[in-house]
């Protein structure tokens, strides 16, 4: 916050800049997504670590806080019973599912889940479930009760284990009955009232399975939201609303660590905006359950740039920002993935204010909306390489964004006016943009101006 305030004090020196578009995409006429998707913020809830109790009943008490924070979509990590065979740690991986139609007793009962879901809907949230279609636990009833062809099996007839996931058994999507049953699982939860799915390791399943699912589920509810844990234009062709921005996450980490530059970020933006359809949405994040537990917290990976890159995920084109459990209070801790490791306290602090401000910006600034609704990115020329400077504008909504993505102070001397009266999104202060004077940016400083 302090970096932004010092920057705002110098805004009178900012001059207008020549604008250049980052890429060309096909225009879209009809809305591709449910209306509530475009300006939404996703919150990934780790029920086990959300509260000391680690239950739906306790998590329900957290919903008013999240409502005030301004998130819109609650993504629940897997909520189903966890297998015991090959279990990792004491409590096991959420992703080693024993029964898709039941609730993990660690979290409570089906009635507890339904109360949580109803309360979330009363408060205006959408709730999506983690849908793990690639595999079950090795002791799921299907392994012995269903025909052998339901699973991919090795040379001695045992279910195949992928990677170091010895606590799972891979399902066989060449088997039509598996496809049918997994689509029935989706329908079961849609009928319970959930609003969509985050689809685990989506690239492991055939593309046509997702297309079939999309068609059948949206015949029941056309506003269902599908998020792919995968990255590539093919996921949008398959019917997904959004996929992961893994490459962006890597570039941000590398810039913060001095391994890449703003030029690499611009290259990623160019590739995305030319290779993906205009309506494509990418989930943008500085943390999630995988990054936090296996790669480190955003503070470990991004250091002094943690807030800067978090803010960037809110303003890049076609993006949908994600907040992971604990980020809203700046919790700098790697969660134990297979054990109980709850957040010790939820006192609101500067990070709460930071994310609340960004969420409000997201809701009220059409230029920043996702997919085809938001404004295209137009670069400001005449700036040093270390500074990412651009505008986005649509239907009278405009943002001007400047990010010093380096650990050194930077200066900009623009040449062509793009002057006007703006409001600083993070402070609410008014800013007059004038032409012809030098602008100084502190290390990792950023500013988001709206009009």
Locations of the language-model features?
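Short, solvent-exposed turn/loop segments enriched in Gly/Ser/Thr/Pro and often Arg
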Residues: 75-89, 130-139, 200-206, 229-233, ...
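C-terminal motif of bacterial Sec signal peptides marking the signal peptidase cleavage site
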Residues: 19-21
């Amino acid at each position: 916050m302090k970096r932004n305030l010092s920057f705002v004090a110098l805004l009178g020196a900012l001059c207008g800049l020549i604008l250049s578009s980052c890429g060309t995409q096909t225009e879209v006429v009809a809305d591709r997504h449910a209306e509530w998707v475009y300006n939404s913020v996703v919150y990934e809830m780790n029920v086990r670590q959300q509260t000391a109790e680690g239950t739906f009943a306790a998590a329900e008490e957290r919903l008013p806080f999240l409502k005030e924070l301004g998130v819109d979509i609650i993504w629940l990590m897997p909520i189903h019973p966890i297998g015991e065979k090959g279990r990792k740690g004491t409590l096991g991986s959420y992703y080693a599912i024993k029964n898709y139609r039941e609730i993990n007793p660690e979290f409570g009962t089906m009635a507890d889940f339904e109360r949580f879901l109803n309360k979330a809907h009363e408060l205006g949230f959408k709730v999506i479930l983690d849908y793990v279609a690639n595999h079950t636990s090795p002791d799921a009833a299907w392994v012995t009760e269903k025909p052998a062809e339901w699973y991919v099996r090795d040379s001695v007839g045992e279910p195949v284990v992928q990677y170091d996931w010895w606590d799972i058994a891979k399902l066989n999507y060449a088997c039509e009955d598996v496809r049918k049953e997994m689509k029935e699982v989706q329908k079961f939860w849609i009928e319970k009232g959930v609003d969509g799915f985050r689809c685990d390791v989506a690239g492991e399943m055939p593309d046509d399975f997702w297309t079939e699912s999309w068609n059948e589920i949206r015949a029941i509810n056309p506003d269902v939201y599908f998020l792919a844990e995968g990255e590539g234009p093919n996921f949008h062709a398959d019917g997904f609303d959004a996929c992961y921005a893994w490459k962006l996450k890597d570039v941000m980490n590398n810039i913060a660590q001095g391994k890449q530059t703003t030029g690499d970020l611009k290259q990623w933006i160019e590739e995305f905006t030319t290779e993906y359809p205009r309506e494509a949405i990418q989930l943008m994040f500085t943390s999630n359950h995988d990054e936090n537990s296996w790669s480190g917290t955003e503070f470990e990976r991004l250091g002094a740039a943690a807030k800067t890159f978090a803010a960037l995920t809110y303003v890049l084109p076609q993006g949908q920002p994600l907040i992971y459990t604990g980020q809203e209070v700046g919790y700098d801790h790697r969660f134990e993935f297979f054990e109980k490791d709850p957040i010790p306290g939820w006192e609101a602090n500067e990070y709460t204010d930071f994310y609340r401000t960004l969420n409000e910006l997201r809701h009220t600034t059409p230029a920043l909306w996702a997919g085809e609704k938001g404004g295209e990115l137009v670069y400001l020329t005449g700036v040093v390489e270390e500074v990412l400077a651009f505008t986005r504008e649509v239907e009278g909504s405009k943002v001007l964004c400047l990010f010093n993505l380096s650990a050194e102070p930077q200066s900009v001397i623009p040449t062509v006016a793009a002057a006007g009266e703006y409001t600083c999104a993070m402070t609410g202060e008014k800013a007059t943009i004038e032409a012809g004077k030098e602008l100084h940016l502190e290390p990792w400083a950023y500013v988001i101006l709206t009009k």
